[in-house]
Amino acid sequence: MKFLFDLFPVILFFGVFKWGEGNTEAAQAFGQQYLSGVVSDGLVTASQAPILLATAVAIIATVLQIGYLLVKGRKIDKTLWLSLGIIVVFGGATIYFHNETFIKWKPTVLYWCFAAALLFSQIFLKKNLIRTMMEKQMSLPDGIWHRLNLSWVGFFLTMGLINLYVAYSFSTATWVNFKLFGGMGLMVAFIVAQSLLLSKYMKEPQ
């Protein structure tokens, strides 16, 4: 359930973009009605409407996520606050300047922030964040914890580069597909491969 909750803005982003692609006139009319006041020249074209509407919905969905958690009195992960800040800045720039380049950079910036946090904590704070999150599930030698942390740093750096490659080499529609299916698929594949390699260290349930 948490997995779907975390994916909520991404799924809505994908759904709204696909709707806009298939209903360009309706998307333009909707975008002109609700976004004309926040775009720089007050004009939402048919070609821009799908990505602008999808971006606006993703921003709203992320705000609603945090609002829901606050109302429920639940702890909000720092990663969610970071995601909110990045999508507000880059998504807001996309809408205001009606330029999809900004939102296409959003996943890369988020991935690289994760990588920087893991690396900074390990080098300067002498704290292994991956170990902090996973040590209740497995017992590893210090050297393996170190390499595991670095593997996640490398993964996030690589994901950021792959996102940029797709964003600049293919159409916006292809990038939107990759954002949901490609990015999530690579994440799942990495976690599964890592789990198989570390399975012998998993703690048995008491």
Swiss-Prot record:
The keyword Lyase does not apply. Keywords: Cell inner membrane, Cell membrane, Membrane, Transmembrane, Transmembrane helix. Belongs to the YciB family. PANTHER family: INNER MEMBRANE-SPANNING PROTEIN YCIB, INTRACELLULAR SEPTATION PROTEIN A-RELATED. It holds the Pfam family IspA. GO terms for cellular component: plasma membrane. Plays a role in cell envelope biogenesis, maintenance of cell envelope integrity and membrane homeostasis. It is found in: Cell inner membrane. The chain crosses the membrane at residues 51-71, 79-99, 105-125, 150-170, 178-198. This is Inner membrane-spanning protein YciB. It is a multi-pass membrane protein.
